[in-house]
Amino acid sequence: MQLLDRILGQPCRLCGRRGAVTLGPVSPTHPAAFETTDFRLRHCRHCDVVYLDPLPTAGDLELLYEDSVQFSDSHYTDPQQVEKILDYYGTSVRNLRLLPDSGGRILEIGAGLAWVSRACKAIRPDVTTVAQDVSSECATHCAWVDQYFVGALESLPARGPYDLISLTHVIEHLADPEAMLRSVASLLTQDGKAFITAPFRPTGWTPDQGVTPWRTYSYLHVPAHITYFSRDWFAQTLPALELDIVHWDATHENGQAFELVLRRI
């Protein structure tokens, strides 16, 4: 087994194929008493994903998301910043034709302050907005959300179907992103859309550069960000989930973040 690992690389946690190599060690970037403090980044030659290894423990995830305050600083509250965020999401839902028709339904997963719901309500007030998050931090601060559910997605009472589901800077936090996408597919209407944004990689990074550029990457959040995805991984994974890529753009923030739209087929 060790010989195979040296020759072919270790099995990738995301695609399962041999080809995952270690880029190098990374340390926690969040000040907390985590159970695990020794992490490394791995890159898969087959699906081109970079992921954190080992996975954070359940206790560390609870510490990150349920026992901490995430949305109180000026990045989320300054009026100019709020206007900038809403302009981006409003422009995106228009240009990418994501806005449901009158009476349509929107689900925001890992919603936080539910920016997509807010942008959609501003354009079309009669859409129904549902937000889900495991933290209650923002649940009473989102007047633009018709129903804010605090709890796991599988416990969501409003099971859909939805015309639009958004996961904005959410999927990179998940230990099992494929399972989440399967749930998304089950909650979408036929031809419904999913809007996903997430960190991509350091500007201009290539695997031969190793781990060094990652250590100064603004989106290296250890252990919060578990996976840095690629278009290849989505293209390999989605057909079995009855989802299709209709838009991919990895040029955001000078190539540091991507925007993805999926369609239920």
What residue spans do the PLM features occupy?
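Short glycine-rich, flexible loops that bind phosphorylated cofactors or substrates
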Residues: 173-174, 203
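A structural motif corresponding to the C-terminal end of an alpha-helix
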Residues: 237-243
